[in-house]
Amino acid sequence: MRSDWTALQPEVLGAIKAHTGPIHQVVPAPAGNHADVAATVHAAAGRVFVKAARKLSEETDGPEVRSLRNEARIVPHVADFAPRLHWTVEAGGWLVLGFEHVDGRHADYTPGSPDLEILAKTVHALQGARCPDVVRMSVERRWATVAEDVSPMAGGALLHTDVNPENLLITPDGRAALVDWAHASRGAAWVELGLLIPWLLKAGHAPVEVGNWLSQFPSWTAADATHIDLFSEVFAERWRLRAEDSGCPAWVALHADLTRRWAEYRRGSG
């Protein structure tokens, strides 16, 4: 559950203000789950997007802090896609990142939306980018608990891994910015497209339409169909297991249903 800005102690706020100057307004972010606090801060130095996470103890990082550390390490190396990281603060048991504020809206992935062209252009560019050495996570490890052999998903391509509509910001002049690089990984390039599938289904595309849209990407059409089938099955199984938890949020159950639909489609179209 996300915390309010008021959860930040005076020591932390003072460290932030050393970068921003006096703060005039704080607008909490409506979505996202990789930080305890996320907000647009209006301050003397201008607007900045702030993400903060509380450590478990002075010596121990929690999952949100680890995510932010990972993002802070990666973002400077993906400047063609991500908002700039202006500063980092560690004080009072908190890690705080200050990002360039992007004046943009969340993308619309519904059928017929012009944003789909922007999404495609962004993904094409991402697939052509070199994976920085600082990207340490291997995407195939996500499914190691549900499959004996996950090597078909391995590779050296740069993967954002979460190009959902809320993470693709589109500015008034049509530029795109990819935010939330906490789980960027390296792997087979086509896996990025596989991870997009639930978001396209959720936006109203039929599975066959999703398959047609994905066919514009060389990495997808060149991938071994049996590898895509394997991915579809382990993707659905991992989300099914997550959704079995009685306390899981509604979006997890929905994601499990969407990945199941895609796996069933792949079985039927094989």
Question: PLM features: what roles do these ranges have?
Answer:
Residues Q9, H34, R47-G92, L97, ...:
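A conserved alpha-helical element in kinase catalytic cores
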Residues V89, V102-D103:
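Residues forming the ATP-binding cleft of Hanks-type serine/threonine protein kinase domains
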Residues D4-W5, K17-A43:
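ATP-binding glycine-rich phosphate-binding loop
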Residues L8-H19, A125-T161, L169-A177:
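An alpha-helical support segment within catalytic cores of ATP-dependent transferases
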